[in-house]
Amino acid sequence: SGSTGRTTVGQLLTPAGQLTTLGDLPLNEALSPDGRYLIVSNNGQGTQSLQVIKTATGKVVQTIPYKSPESLYMGLAFSPDGTHLFASAAGNHKIRTYHFDCGKLVETSAIQMPVVSPKLTKVNLYPAGLAVTNDSKRLVVADQLADAVSVIDLATNKIQTTHIGHRPVWVTLSKDSTKAFVSSQGGADVAEVDITKSQPLATHKINVGFHPNKSVLTPDGKSLYLSLIHI
């Protein structure tokens, strides 16, 4: 009431803004490069979904549902020109890809993540956080259950994977897209990964508080802000 609003999970906000009703367990969102649309990934029980919200009105203009066993996860990333969106589908061992135009998503061919290692052992990469390089040529993936990070060549879908940290969950790229900063929830650290080589290379580890999650780089590229679930 008045200037205070209540969110769908019971939190009180003052002053109250506009609330948009979403699906179950929204874990992540991605703003289109032009700022006109917000994509939300809903990752709860039963039917999961992607929703497209028009930022000028707060209205949901498209919902794409996925019934079990099809799934989504927290990874969402636009190409720099805003024409393509990538969404992780961890339970399905793939990255979903979409064409995006005028507020509408059209799903195209998915990128299949490997389920067998070069040594022919079973692997479950469980793709989580995603980031696209400035030239739109590569997609960087945090492989949460494999303790690894992968770089995908978007022209060939060739995947190069390097082991890092413990339970990596989020990826943020440097301003020039030469480095990836990968948050490891189980390792209480952020790994700095050189992605300019044919094989990604972890070069530095930054120890942070317990359970690091999402991060964002300042516009000048000099500072990385990180959310910690437990301190």
Residue ranges and their predicted role:
Residues Q18, I64-S68, T108-K122:
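Surface-exposed loop and turn segments in beta-propeller and other repeat-based domains
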Residues D34-R36, D81-T83, D135-K137, D176-T178, ...:
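Short coil/turn segments that connect the beta-strands within blades of beta-propeller domains
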Residues K54-G58, F100-G103, D153-N157, I195-S198:
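Short loop/turn segments that connect beta-strands within beta-propeller blades
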Residues I229-I231:
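Conserved small/polar residues in nucleotide/adenosyl-binding loops
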